[in-house]
Every structure is written in structure tokens, then in C-alpha cells.
């Protein structure tokens, strides 16, 4: 006998809704970030030593020739774990804080900025230890560890605790919070603009059409994000690889800036634009596809 029972719909702004968005963030961020590990590896090494490779392609060739093809995925494990946790906090947190702040303020740019900043601040606390392992693994040759578990044990033993995992937390916040504020706010506004010029209203479009808008909006938002957050991204790489024992964050940042100058803050920008543009578009594609699959409205 055929059942006429309708699938249970997830109610907005319930615990189930936020748990679903959190899961969507994990699916959107962990696989996408780890899939571009080879690009990230070359970018990080060029940020630390701009003379190491003459181009990205030459970087890949040298890594494969000198270290083997598997080494282009150095840092994959730490990236996957770290950004899965970060994606959970970022997307789930954004949905929660956007709704919370909208009950206090009129919905709009201010709410998007506040919600994304709060969510990213908390998400980075989960990301930071794995980002530290990844950067150290990618910028030491040969890599100082074989995998994320090995890296965790070594860094914990070297510092005698959790201190080494969080020495880059302030630069990470400086990189990620502006990036995420730009990512979510520009995405929301770009998507709203796209919908405003299309012949159909969003509510009249099918899921595939809405997801296509999310993909385009995500790529455009990603380009802006890359430019906004790149100088801090360079400093995160430098501090994690070059900060001296017992050196304060401000002293380390000042010393590194004096060494590389303003232009050095933009090393690897074009790679990052391609990387972040692609990354952001696919994250929004995956996240909104997941939301549509479980019966939730897409973002924007």
C-alpha cells in the first residue's frame, strides 16, 4: 500500500535547523578546503620564501620531482579536520546569530556583518590548532610531521601544552573575521541583486535555479574575500613558521613586516584569488544544495 505520508519538514530556527546548517557547513568546508591542498601548499611556501619557486606550475613540478607526487597533498589531514570544524561553527553559527541579531536590529548589512564576525570568532578557536599544524607541516622541508596526529603530538611536546597551537590565533582572527564578514555580507547582497534583476522571483524558481545563483554569487564574493584577507593570510604563514620562542605577537608581527614590507603582504595574491573564488563558490553551491535537499530555503 502506497503511503501518502509527507516527509517531515524542518522548522526554521529550531535546534534541528541549526544542527542541519552545522552539518551543511562541515560538508561545504572540509572537503573543499582539503581538495585545494596542493594550491595552498605552494601559496604558503611562496609566502614564507618568495624566491622558492618562479611560478605555481614550477612549484608543483619541483615538489613532485624532489619530494614525490604524494607530497603535493602535504597538510591534507590537518586541513580537512580543521576546516570541517570551522565550517560547522561558521555556517551553523552564522544562521544562529543572524536570527538572534535580527530580533534586535533591522535585517540587513549590519546584521550580516555582526553575525558573520561572531560566528567566525568562535569557529577559529576550533580551527587554530589544525591551521598551526598545517602551516608548519607545509613550510618546513622536509615536513616536520607525517600526519595530523603526529603533528599534534610533536607540537604539544615541544611547547609543553596548547600554547604552540594558539600562537597564531590573533593573526588568524585578523585574516578570517574580515574574510568571513566579506564572504557572507557580499554574498547576501550580491545574491539579492541577482534575484532583483531576474525575470522570476526567488520563490518561483526551482532548486537548481536558486543554487546556480548561489554559485555565481559565491564566486564574486570569493574574489572580494581574497583581497580583503590576504595580508593577514601572509602574516599567519610567517608567524607560524618564523615566530621565535617567547616572542610576543606584536614584536613578531613588527619584525616580520620590517623584513617583507608592504609589498610582501601581497605575495601569492593571484593564486589566492583563484583559490578562494573557486573555494567560496563551491562552498555556497554545496551548502545551499544541502539545504535545498533537506527542504530548507537557500541563503539570500
From Swiss-Prot:
Which sequence positions carry the modification called N-acetylmethionine? Answer: 1
**What Gene3D superfamilies does the database record attribute to this sequence?**
Mitochondrial carrier domain
Show the stretches that span the lipid bilayer: 22-42, 70-89, 108-128, 171-192, 211-231, 260-280
Membrane protein topology class: Multi-pass membrane protein
Q: Which GO terms describe its biological process?
A: copper ion transmembrane transport; intracellular copper ion homeostasis; mitochondrial phosphate ion transmembrane transport; phosphate ion transmembrane transport
Cite the entry's keywords alphabetically. Acetylation, Membrane, Mitochondrion, Mitochondrion inner membrane, Repeat, Transmembrane, Transmembrane helix, Transport
Q: Where are the Solcar repeats?
A: 16-100, 107-193, 209-293
* Listed GO MF terms: copper ion transmembrane transporter activity; phosphate transmembrane transporter activity
Name the job this protein performs. Transport of phosphate groups from the cytosol to the mitochondrial matrix.
Q: Which PANTHER family match?
A: SOLUTE CARRIER FAMILY 25 (MITOCHONDRIAL CARRIER PHOSPHATE CARRIER), MEMBER 3, LIKE-RELATED-RELATED (PTHR45671), SOLUTE CARRIER FAMILY 25 MEMBER 3 (PTHR45671:SF10)
The protein's name in its UniProt record: Mitochondrial phosphate carrier protein 2
Q: Report the source organism.
A: Saccharomyces cerevisiae (strain ATCC 204508 / S288c)
Its taxonomic placement starts with:
Eukaryota, Fungi, Dikarya, Ascomycota, Saccharomycotina
By which gene is this protein encoded? PIC2
